[in-house]
Amino acid sequence: FNAGGGGGSSGGTAADISYDNSKSGISAANVQEAIDALSVLTLTIQAVPAQSGSLTYTGSTQSPTWKGYDSSMMTIGGVTSGINAGTYTATFTPIGKYVWTDGTQEAKSVSWTIGRAEVKNVPAQTGSVTYNGSAQSPSWSNYNSSQLTIGGTRSATNAGSYSATFTPTSNYKWSDGTTTAKSASWTIGKATGSITLSASSLSLTYPKTSG
């Protein structure tokens, strides 16, 4: 309300008071009415906060940055931090004289995310494996069991070509954005044969001659 100067008489109306686009002579009742009107004054929060920027899995606890969040206007609750890649839900509740644009002070839910980290390369066989009559498995470059699970044919005995598969775990994705299994070929080479000859293992037969 606005109080304006009036006449010099101390016994009459000394000021005018206006509120809610109305104007009347000052009185105790009007002052109280103005105070009551101000007591129910509300301030509107124009937008519910939203996640600003992106988060990527690091293995550590992270919290999002919020666009439109002011702790003097609202409280934050729900899930406000996380470790694993995925979607979480925070809540925002107006405090004091603040309300949402719908006039309520009810908590509003807002989703936020932590994205999967990237696995840049599909594992590949490193080194060679040669047939030895026993089951063998290859060594893999770029393979980390915390990032990828291995499947398909992981070991074999005979010489030949085989196919293993690699699938990102829940916090990882391939560089193309996919999370499905990718195949990787690996081989067991043929062993090199050898023949050992000794004098005791040989016998020679000569044809009989007449004469």
Where are these regions (language model features)?
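A signal for long, low-complexity, Ser/Thr/Asn-enriched, surface-exposed stalk/shaft
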Residues: 1-42
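Solvent-exposed beta-strand/loop surfaces, strongest in extracytoplasmic domains of secreted
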Residues: 41-211
